[in-house]
Amino acid sequence: MKTIGIDLWDGQLRQGGNAQTIMRPAVVPTIRRGIRDLFLENYPRFAPVCRTVEEPGIAIIAIDDKTARAAGVVKVLARVGRSVAAVAGRHDQCDLYLRGNDGLALRQFTVVLSPVQSWAPGAKAAQYRVIDLRTNDGMMDEDGRMLRGIRAEGPSILRCSGYTFFILALGDPTDYPQSATDAWDVMPERVYFDELEVCAGGSAAKLRLPRNDLRQSYIFRTQGPRETGVINHTACGVVGNERDLAGRLEIEGPNRRVILDVGHDALRDGVLLGRYGRCDASEALDDPSLSRVHALLVCENDKLLVIDTASYNGTRIIGEHRARVIELDRDVDLQIGKHTRMRWHWLG
């Protein structure tokens, strides 16, 4: 089965031209239907798609809050030994392409699915992370709390820019009974925590011991790519803490060369690359073939990944085909866009 399977519904047609980018103040979207109602009404649409999958993975289901109809589903299947990623947004290069709300960013968030050890029935469920791509509004959890990312193993529910997203586990067709009410009732309870590294109070004070009589899905709120300030086009800059440097990113475009020293915390949260002002070193990148938000450099499961965020001209190891996820396990030259090269060096 394909690593990423896509079903788009309700008028989400590609090649229709990408809507003009809209800059506006952050607002909290109005949810017209309750989350349970949205799930029950749309279950007959997405459940048959999910039942067909017997490999571990996740389904990302988007429901338009305005119409209360499912807009699409992306099935992301886990692989042994390598991460898989998918991107949601209003750009037609996105896997989960959504055009029903102009408030959604062209590239809203990426989902990174961790490798699995086995595909055998009963094996440990796939873990995943959702990372907001430094958008204006970010996301909300089902309790209405603003966030920039989550890490989870099990179902989660997110809301942003007029959509509700159900992220559900794949691999066991019996998780999707015929009755929508039964499916909702057996869905594990979502229990939210803050990661100790980014929460002043830590998560210990909020910790609830697991209950044997309940199925629970533990979700950790995380940070996303941070605002790192302006880096001028002449030389170099620092992303993160100078005293905790992880490595150096060298970017060479048609006329400019940029050096970014990146800290361990910044790598964990993610370093966003592209021509947009919300990306690191955007003022220094002079290649028009780069997308506004082109790639994400992030450390996941002790592996450094470059994730192409649905760019138009792609990301690739020089001499190879474009790829969505590239693991930097050695010194290697990458090409982003048509005329820009990039190399990572570990410093510590």
Residue ranges and their predicted role:
Residues 1-100, 117-122, 150-286, 340, ...:
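Intrinsically disordered, low-complexity acidic Ser/Thr-rich regulatory segments
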Residues 77-157, 263-337:
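Forkhead-associated
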